[in-house]
Amino acid sequence: MICCCCDIMAQQDSSTVIGRLQYVYALKDAINDCVWQGFTDKNNDVPLIYYDDSCCYVVNPSKKILNQYAAELVYKDNGVNIYQTRRIDNIPFHMHVTITDEQESIDYHTPIMRCSSLEQTGKTIPDVKTINTWATMIMHEYFHGFQFKQRGFFEAYVAIISDCPQDTLPKFQAQLEWYKESIQQENELLLKAIDALDLDAMKAYIRAFLELRDSRRTKIKELGNTDITSAEQLMEITEGSARYIEYRLYDYLGNFSLAQEKWLYTVGKNYYYATGFNLLRLLDKLGTEYHSRIFTDVTTLEKALRELSY
């Protein structure tokens, strides 16, 4: 097990930052070895920009980043190259992946992970008190970068979101009580399927889940002429798999009980985080391989369940 004893009161200097970034990349290796093979492949590498108070540290920057920002190499070892440069922007908090259509941008059609320091993250999100919590948040977002490195995913994402904007699903959930109730019931059926003790019971819960889901999608299409199927499948894959990485990393780090972390598997304001996460857990229990195709076909999770339900 990898261990890092830094906490939010640690003095922030260059050596502290480099140590934190080394730790993040060691955890990335652990995820590759224990959870998702290919995560550390060179062709899947995503530059990481760490925002300190007065400067930025960039891990494995692209040539475009180095051409746009004067940077000094401050650490190099085992495929991890860390550069220091001026602060790239004045946005107070970062914890996300960016990718744009602007040709002059450093993230033109390629993902870049951006994160604030542990200290700034703790100020913005008070629950973040340890480096493990901070690093797990980073890994959730970094996995989004990994997703966009998969062939065809960016194009599929843009096409689907163009037809059904990302805020559509949360709006339906917030504004339509019947929609919200159906989501809650669907998620409960997924949880029951995960906890089922025999295959027949599991299949019965899966069938009930699919019937309820199909009914909700049909109703929303009839009411507003909106087909949410592809958008829902996309967002469950996108956010569900990133939450799955969080879960597996928490478990790897130890001293973790899923039962006590209900936010991971219960429905929040963006329900597809939980339903997507639970779909992956259910396929794990069924022994279904999905890692190799989940980002090339957004129907992967549901298609697998439909095939296994009878």
Predicted segments — roles?
Residues 1-16:
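Bacterial Sec-dependent N-terminal signal peptides
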Residues 12-89, 93:
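Start-of-domain marker
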Residues 18, 22, 30, 211-310:
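Pan-zinc metallopeptidase signature
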Residues 72-131:
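Active-site scaffold of zinc-dependent metalloenzymes
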Residues 126-134, 154-158:
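Membrane-interface helix-loop-helix junctions at boundaries between adjacent transmembrane segments
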Residues 136-149:
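Active-site recognition of the HExxH zinc-binding catalytic motif
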Residues 148, 152, 285-288:
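Short, well-ordered loop/turn and helix-capping segments at boundaries between secondary-structure elements
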Residues 149-228, 232-254, 276:
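Post-HExxH zinc-binding segment in Zn-dependent metallohydrolases
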